[in-house]
Amino acid sequence: MKCSICVHTSKTKKIINYEGKPICVDCLTMLKYPPNFEKMKKEVEEILYNLKKEGGKYHCILAFSGGKDSVLALKLLKEKFKLNPLCVMVDNKYMAKEAIENALNVTKHYQVDLMILNRDYTDLFEDAIKRGESPCRRCSRLILREVWRVTKLLGLKYIITGHELPFGHSAIREMKEGIKMIRLLAPYKFKEEEKYKMLEDLPWKKPDLGGYTTNCLVLGVALERFYDKYGFSFEIDRIATLVRLGLLSKEKAKKELEKPKVPKEIYEELRRRGLKI
């Protein structure tokens, strides 16, 4: 059975009959409790416009990967809010070289500082790929921990990220010790084609990495192995949410959820960097 709103099926989410139509439980929740994006936008903009009034070398920390979403977040911080962030990139040993080049080029373009922390997540990635599971949540958690430490060290209050989906009904989340995280893109509901259009005037090039990513070498392989094990993509919840919110058509979503074709050059590069796959 297929959800009549998003791309979930009974294989990936519980489907019920609602007013004569099949609908997944996530879509039902949204219908009953729809997010207020205008309210989200007002909350985020109030914080960021007020940050401009504060002194100091940096107004906030931007969790920066060189991918399209964090680059777009930087564009908004600089051009819309006139803020000076410190961009913090965590190179987990498996960032695409194109992503690092993009990060260097874009931060130079905006004349903002870029801090790159070198880490090694080989064990995490090997474990996830071996088991056919997603490494993304664990990787993101480790990266955010590093970014939070820098934020605390510098005495700053806000971490900005390029996440496109909110925390339920808010784009802001409280972290430890008074630090807050803001998912900057969430209130604006940018579609993919809009994002790429907005990046056209920047020194940023889209890499071909397999999967939806514009910065991570591991993702395509992880998606491939998960698909082999379960018969669907671990991106299903995120993609379904994009469809639910009108940010992605069902046709494009279905294509995004297909098993990726990872270029052999990606496998070769991962092995060269020390990943046993």
From Swiss-Prot:
It comes from the Archaea. InterPro entries: ATPase_PP-loop_MJ1599 (IPR012121), Ni-pincer_cofactor_biosynth (IPR052188), PAPS_reduct_dom (IPR002500), Rossmann-like_a/b/a_fold (IPR014729). It holds the Pfam family PAPS_reduct. One of its GO terms (molecular function) is catalytic activity. This is Uncharacterized protein MJ1599. It comes from Methanocaldococcus jannaschii (strain ATCC 43067 / DSM 2661 / JAL-1 / JCM 10045 / NBRC 100440).
